[in-house]
UniProtKB/Swiss-Prot annotation:
Keywords: Ribonucleoprotein, Ribosomal protein. It comes from Dictyostelium discoideum (Social amoeba). GO terms for biological process: ribosomal small subunit assembly; translation. Belongs to the eukaryotic ribosomal protein eS19 family. One of its GO terms (molecular function) is RNA binding. This is Small ribosomal subunit protein eS19.
Length: 148
């Protein structure tokens, strides 16, 4: 039976993000900030995240988004993760998330050599080693799901 090339786009996003977050936590190469347990992800949120491993999931999500979109910067990802600001009896309005969390996660991915800053266009792009690593994890998920 011939092996097929599996990329990140061939697996379920939720499965990939959960698997990559577990991988990041298990390897211990990501430094968790001191403010991890008290920081809110956005100004319009009332409470910090309930999942103590939320930073790993945000890093995994950003790695996937950089792989798929590429060339986007912090401002774009602030809008991508944004949501509705609840204004009481007044109408809701869209609000961006905090840029510090996004910036920190992107720096951690740069330290892991998964992404790099695009010198020409700005923003972040996936590196060859980052593409290889993410595709390798996607292949493991694909093989486990399609096991005969």
């Amino acid at each position: 039976m011939a092996t097929t090339a599996v990329t990140l786009k061939d697996v379920c996003p939720q499965e990939f993000i959960a698997t990559y977050a577990r991988f990041l936590k298990k390897t211990g190469r990501v430094q968790i900030p001191k403010w991890n347990d008290i920081a809110k992800t956005a100004t319009y949120r009332e409470l910090p995240p309930t999942n103590p491993d939320w930073i790993y999931y945000r890093i995994a999500t950003l790695a996937r988004k950089v792989y798929i979109r590429g060339g986007d910067g912090v401002a774009t990802y602030r809008r991508v993760f944004g949501g509705n600001r609840r204004n009481g009896v007044r109408p809701n309005h869209f609000a961006d998330v905090n840029g510090g969390n996004i910036r920190y996660c992107l720096k951690q991915l740069q330290n892991l050599k998964v992404i790099e800053t695009d010198a020409v266009k700005g923003g972040r792009t996936i590196t060859a080693t980052g593409r290889r690593d993410l595709d390798r994890i996607a292949k493991q998920i694909y093989d486990k799901k399609n096991k005969i």
